[in-house]
């Protein structure tokens, strides 16, 4: 039996330390981390997305499952039961991201814009929240369109940032407890942006890439928004209009603005890394 200690995993360009052991009987197999799951590189079989002391959580395109380390499935949740969407007839919803465990429930976000909580012991549905218009008149609790969802470790609540809406979902109350349009809250700051992309939760802030109202569909700006104070606290024009006109260089959604310590990092479409030193904001 092979025992391998997993010490560092790279995920979303951030280093996460995990002090867990992965045990597998075949000593010839190699494991690596990809797409939020442990993967056997020879069979492409997914192992565990979340590893606890005596069980793991994993998912495929069709099911989310809880299993112990003796290959016993404790429960399975069929993703087909979440329903389809009028925008993609015939397609089944899939998990976009497993967010975390809070108050005895496991939360995940789906491709069709749904936020779902399952009872960790039974796999039963505890809460279903949706911003998908297809879910009106259904068992989903409707809210404004959910965007990028983040699990906040400090209070185990979930933060959603969409194109213009900010929401907090209280995982204990199982309810949306805060919701506002940040363009309306800060019209002279973040309200000057036509669109924002790739928000990243960073403590009391979220970072973003943005297109100003006067721009023409290309991303040149980055910014930091204080979601508690509800105001833009910093912005910067990374790519000038002149540079874009000459080189067509721009920022792209797959390369968000990262904050690490007092440094900010963002890459442009030409793979240039821009580094900023963050002062008090």
Protein language model features and the residues they cover:
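Secretory-pathway ectodomains
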Residues: 1-281
